Amino acid sequence: MNGNKSLYPIWLGVLGVALLAGLVAGAFIFMHGHVLFNANDVLIWTLPLGVYIFLALASSGLTLLSALPLVFGIKKFEPVAKRLVFLAIATLCGGFVSIGLELGSIFHMIYILLSPNLSSPIWWMGAIYSVELVVLAVKFWKMHTGDYHSSFSKFLGTASFALALVAPLMIGSVFGLTESRATYFGPLMSIYCLLMALLSGTALFILYSMVVERVSGSGSAGEHHAVIDDFCRIFTYATGIVMVFTILRFIMESATTIPAFLAYHQFAHSFGAWHGFHFEVVLGLFLPFVLMLVPSVRQSTGGKVVTSSLILLGTLAMHMEILLAGQSHPVGPKAEQFPQYVQYVPSLWEWLVLVFALAVMLLLYTLGERYLKLNEAPTG
């Protein structure tokens, strides 16, 4: 982001304030634990876990997009391959910041590493994403040194693609295998997470590309413009597919008489749902899809920024809606001391975890764009 040097120190200052606030929040969370979160015996997964899911899936989506040139050999996408890999790394780092603070203690992170549970989808989720981060880092280093086409570099590209396919499926299985929670259970959750990964990753790359183009003051070259247009097509298709899955999910939920779903229809949360009406789906999924069908919106920089921003906000809210709805209806002995469904509003500390994770991610974006020559394309 070299084009507008006067804004660069201001931007770094904003990130510095956000990082400082996040570090203070992290210190308090590690000292006092989950008592700082608005969690309870029923609702134990809150905003920090939702942020982790959102960023981890977006990272997987970016990795899947990078496979177009690196695995499938589509050369027109090679100029953006290095940037895609780096964005995947930075986004996943932000996700790890959020999940690290969600655990409430740094000793919990060490304990997970030292006591693997091979029968736990949650452990496999963390293990796969940890391996994916290492593979992506090595792949980026190989690309940074100009090695795109050696056998080892191609192996890393294929491995990262495979991990990016499996990781969202594993996140979905964390919820889909939970038989005691009807709103989680089912095989479609893994497929839904994979589609959401592709959608949010594509939206993030389009938004980032438009911002970099604007800040750097460089207009899109013909080839780069064509690549962004192709990503916009992928973005539109992914939005449409996720929209169909979402509609089918609503239809199935509305036809059931399972108590958990009946309570779910009355559930309201601070991320867009109110008495069964999901504003986050309408504004964060349906509206962007309609806008992307309009050629003038789809081809304009402002249209790309607005639609991709709406999708990112919408997908985060949709992740939170699914996460909270599955816990909102107390079951077993807990049903005797709690209301029919439990409400949730994030605490200040949870919002600071979100700020910290995004600040780490954006700082890595900024430094990478400035010093790591992310617009390099392979030669030969």
Regions found by a protein language model. Give the residues of each.
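N-terminal regions that are enriched for targeting/export leaders
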Residues: 1-48
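Juxtamembrane/interface segments at transmembrane-helix termini
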Residues: 28-37, 41, 69-77, 81, ...
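Peri-membrane helix termini and adjoining interfacial loops of integral membrane proteins
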Residues: 31-36, 107-110, 254-262, 328-336
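Long, contiguous internal "core" modules enriched in hydrophobic/ aromatic residues
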Residues: 2, 8, 14-21, 76, ...
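Alpha-helical transmembrane segments of multi-pass membrane proteins
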Residues: 14-34, 97-103, 166-175, 365
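TerminUS-proximal long segments
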Residues: 302-380
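Membrane helical hairpin/interfacial module
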Residues: 43-107, 122-124, 128
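Membrane-interface transmembrane-helix boundary segments in multi-pass integral membrane proteins
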Residues: 28-30, 49-52, 123, 189-193, ...
